[in-house]
């Protein structure tokens, strides 16, 4: 047996007590480089986390800005709706004032011409309302010839739309023309006629020579207001109409029946029952 090799029975026995050297032992220089790389990796991860945090904060700020924008849009829509409602209320109030002013003017004119103050005290309750603008019997006798000329011209222009149709419960044209005196519409003393086909009183449009057109009533349905034509300016779809001569006969008939002409006439049940012009210019 050798002391250095410790051979015994032909075998080599390592000296365990002396310890063994590791094969993977890293040199000091490489250890230093590894520490530097670890620090760099840690700093890169920290920068990444900071960037992610900033991105999340930016996304949250964007969401908050979008929410504020939606709230502002909602407030704007609410303000627009309130403005539209205020405009509609203003128009309704103006219409009511016009009606009242026309009624007062009619009552005052009647009081001045009659020389009595009973029209002022009784206001709208007139016992026997007499028309302001009347036509004497001599002029009434000459009117049929003029009406024939107007009707011929209306056929050429496509505006003869108010030929009355006899129906049960209504007077025919002969009954309307049987009055000795025809009443003509006077804008200074009589209120504008209206139509209640939608359940609400709506003022009618002027149409033709002294005629009227409904602002809400068409040949098939009722809506307010009549929609405008997209291909023609200041025009609306076809609606119910009444010529000036028919309106004068209607006023004469209502005056003969005792109707108070100081209040607006409802033309809902007196419109022509046949077709209308395709384009109507609102005057």
Swiss-Prot record:
Residue ranges with Basic and acidic residues bias: 151-162
Pfam families in alphabetical order: GAGA_bind
Annotated region (Alanine-zipper), positions in chain: 51-86
Source species, domain of life: Eukaryota
Variant or mutagenesis effect after changing residue 114 to D: In strain: cv. Ak-1
Record flagged with keyword DNA-binding: yes
Tissues expressed in: Expressed in seedlings, leaves and pistils.
Regions annotated as coiled coil: 63-89
Signal peptide: none
Keyword terms of this UniProt record: Coiled coil, DNA-binding, Nucleus, Transcription, Transcription regulation
Region Disordered, residue ranges: 122-176
Molecular function terms from GO: DNA binding
Gene Ontology cellular-component annotations: nucleus
SMART domains, per database record: GAGA_bind
Subcellular location(s) per record: Nucleus
PANTHER family: PROTEIN BASIC PENTACYSTEINE3, PROTEIN BASIC PENTACYSTEINE5
Domain notes: Alanine-zipper domain is involved in homo- or hetero-dimerization via electrostatic interaction.
Quaternary structure annotation from Swiss-Prot or TrEMBL: Homodimer. Heterodimer.
Purpose: Transcriptional regulator that specifically binds to GA-rich elements (GAGA-repeats) present in regulatory sequences of genes involved in developmental processes.
Family in the record: Belongs to the BBR/BPC family.
Protein name stated in the entry: Protein BASIC PENTACYSTEINE5
Species of provenance: Arabidopsis thaliana (Mouse-ear cress)
Gene: BPC5
């Amino acid at each position: 047996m050798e002391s250095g090799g410790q051979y015994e029975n032909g075998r080599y026995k390592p000296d365990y007590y002396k310890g063994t050297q590791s094969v993977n032992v890293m040199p000091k220089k490489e250890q230093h480089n590894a520490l530097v790389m670890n620090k760099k990796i840690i700093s890169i991860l920290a920068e990444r986390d900071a960037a992610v945090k900033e991105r999340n904060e930016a996304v949250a700020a964007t969401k908050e800005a979008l929410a504020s924008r939606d709230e502002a849009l909602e407030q704007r829509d609410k303000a627009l709706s309130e403005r539209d409602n205020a405009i509609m209320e203003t128009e309704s109030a103006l219409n009511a004032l016009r009606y009242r002013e026309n009624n007062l003017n009619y009552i005052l004119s009647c009081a001045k011409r009659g020389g009595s103050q009973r029209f002022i005290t009784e206001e709208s309750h007139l016992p026997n309302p007499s028309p302001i603008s009347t036509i004497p019997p001599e002029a009434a006798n000459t009117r049929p010839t003029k009406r024939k000329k107007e009707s011929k011209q209306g056929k050429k222009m496509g505006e003869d739309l108010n030929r009355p149709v006899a129906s049960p419960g209504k007077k025919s044209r002969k009954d309307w023309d049987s009055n000795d005196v025809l009443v003509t519409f006077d804008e200074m003393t009589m209120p504008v006629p209206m139509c209640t086909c939608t359940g609400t009183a709506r003022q009618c449009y002027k149409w033709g020579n002294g005629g009227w057109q409904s602002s809400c009533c068409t040949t098939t349905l009722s809506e307010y207001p009549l929609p405008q034509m997209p291909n023609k300016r200041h025009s609306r779809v076809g609606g119910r109409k009444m010529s000036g001569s028919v309106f004068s006969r209607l006023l004469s008939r209502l005056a003969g029946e005792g109707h108070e002409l100081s209040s607006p006439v409802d033309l809902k049940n007196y419109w022509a029952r046949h077709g209308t012009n395709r384009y109507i210019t609102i005057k």
